């Protein structure tokens, strides 16, 4: 009798699953770019309104994302032009998956700068696309000549550009991204998962550039648990994407919460501004620490390079702080760690541990 595994694709069996760390109670979770606080905390009236709307949500019915009012709320909050259509996904991960499926003709290629979000490469492999990874410069800036040469040579059906980039936090220039879009015949997805922390966006151009899709998520602005992503682009492309997205792919409670949040976006924006201020404070303090390379960030995290990534990761973990160890994920990420910007107290705890390791004479580094 054949093993059940013999019916499973060999290439999938060779893959590794995305690992989500188990976080013991009481740990500061600074590994996944989540908000350190509930987005409605401190706003009692808004909390009461939220609870009332959740209680009234028709959870006995399948959701209708297109009729929920969320698309209109997104359009209003983020200045998405009327000429653009909007597709909603169960997190931007789902949109990455189905945009890849949309373009995965036999022999088609996907292009991305590296290191970047690991799910680009993962989905290319899942759908049989040739993957072209173009290394960044050593300071994590975009190697534009190399990217343009790869576009010319491989003619990718799909290109992903994270703006700002994850896991580095560095933001490529707008002119560089415009050059890639102009040089590409295929679809270019500008992934603005961290766009709220950047201050610039391609959303106003969505719908007017035929091969541009702009993708965002509510996860990084305080709503990671909702799993809502959205993609804006020309109706010709978004209409094709809508054909393959699963029906009822979002739930009533998430739709209700997201719509309410966008109707009170001033509160959410104030939370974002607080995190941006903490990011700048943390960046300045890290810059004072010797033997540390701190990369400029336009996201809600900071990436650093240290003499020994394992030592710092383990020391932080011993002190009940979890960060993301990037060392080993890509050659350019040697001895790098990514630290989510947390609360002031959490950030101070991280800074104090790093100072203890790198601002005192030691014999073991």
Swiss-Prot record:
Stretch forming the signal peptide: none
Record-level Gene Ontology MF annotations: histidinol-phosphate transaminase activity; pyridoxal phosphate binding
Superkingdom of the source species: Bacteria
Cofactor(s) needed by this chain: pyridoxal 5'-phosphate
Catalytic activity line of the entry: L-histidinol phosphate + 2-oxoglutarate = 3-(imidazol-4-yl)-2-oxopropyl phosphate + L-glutamate
Pfam families named among the record's database cross-references: Aminotran_1_2
Residues with N6-(pyridoxal phosphate)lysine modification: 220
Disulfide bonds: none
Top class in the EC scheme: transferase
Pathway recorded for this protein: Amino-acid biosynthesis; L-histidine biosynthesis; L-histidine from 5-phospho-alpha-D-ribose 1-diphosphate: step 7/9
Alphabetical GO biological process terms: L-histidine biosynthetic process
Keyword set, alphabetical order: Amino-acid biosynthesis, Aminotransferase, Histidine biosynthesis, Pyridoxal phosphate, Transferase
InterPro entries referenced in this protein's UniProt entry, alphabetically: Aminotransferase_I/II_large (IPR004839), HisP_aminotrans (IPR005861), PyrdxlP-dep_Trfase (IPR015424), PyrdxlP-dep_Trfase_major (IPR015421), PyrdxlP-dep_Trfase_small (IPR015422)
HAMAP family named among the record's database cross-references: HisC_aminotrans_2
Assembly behavior: Homodimer.
PANTHER family listed in its UniProt record: HISTIDINOL-PHOSPHATE AMINOTRANSFERASE, HISTIDINOL-PHOSPHATE AMINOTRANSFERASE-RELATED
Family the entry assigns: Belongs to the class-II pyridoxal-phosphate-dependent aminotransferase family. Histidinol-phosphate aminotransferase subfamily.
Protein known as: Histidinol-phosphate aminotransferase
């Amino acid at each position: 009798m054949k093993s059940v595994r013999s019916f499973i694709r060999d290439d999938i069996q060779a893959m590794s699953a995305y690992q989500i760390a188990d976080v013991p109670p009481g740990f500061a979770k600074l590994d996944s770019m989540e908000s350190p606080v509930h987005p409605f905390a401190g706003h009692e009236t808004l909390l009461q309104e939220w609870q009332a709307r959740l209680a009234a949500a028709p959870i006995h019915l399948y959701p209708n994302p297109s009729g929920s009012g969320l698309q209109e709320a997104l359009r209003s909050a983020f200045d998405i032009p009327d000429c653009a259509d909007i597709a909603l996904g169960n997190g931007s991960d789902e949109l990455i998956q189905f945009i890849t499926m949309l373009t995965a003709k036999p022999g088609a290629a996907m292009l991305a700068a590296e290191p970047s979000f690991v799910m680009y490469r993962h989905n290319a492999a899942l759908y049989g696309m040739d993957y072209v990874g173009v290394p960044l410069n050593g300071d994590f800036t975009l190697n534009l000549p190399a990217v343009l040469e790869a576009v010319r040579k491989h003619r990718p059906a799909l290109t992903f550009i994270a703006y700002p980039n994850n896991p580095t936090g560095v933001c490529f220039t707008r002119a560089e991204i415009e050059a890639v879009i102009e040089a590409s015949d295929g679809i270019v997805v500008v992934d603005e998962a961290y766009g709220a922390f950047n201050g610039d966006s391609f959303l106003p151009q969505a719908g007017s550039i035929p091969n541009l899709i702009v993708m965002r998520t509510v996860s990084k602005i305080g709503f990671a648990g909702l799993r809502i992503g959205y993609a804006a682009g020309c109706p010709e492309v978004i209409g094709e994407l809508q054909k393959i997205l699963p029906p009822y792919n979002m739930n009533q409670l998430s739709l209700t919460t997201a719509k309410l949040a966008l109707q009170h976006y001033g509160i959410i924006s104030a939370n974002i501004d607080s995190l941006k201020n903490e990011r700048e404070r943390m960046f300045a303090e890290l810059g004072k620490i010797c033997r540390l390379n701190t990369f400029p960030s336009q996201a809600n995290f900071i990436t650093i390079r240290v003499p020994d990534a394992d030592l710092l990761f383990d020391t932080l973990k011993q002190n009940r702080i979890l960060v993301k160890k990037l060392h080993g994920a890509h050659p350019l990420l040697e001895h790098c760690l990514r630290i989510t910007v947390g609360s002031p107290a959490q950030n101070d705890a991280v800074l104090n541990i790093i100072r203890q390791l790198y601002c005192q004479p030691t014999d073991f580094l």
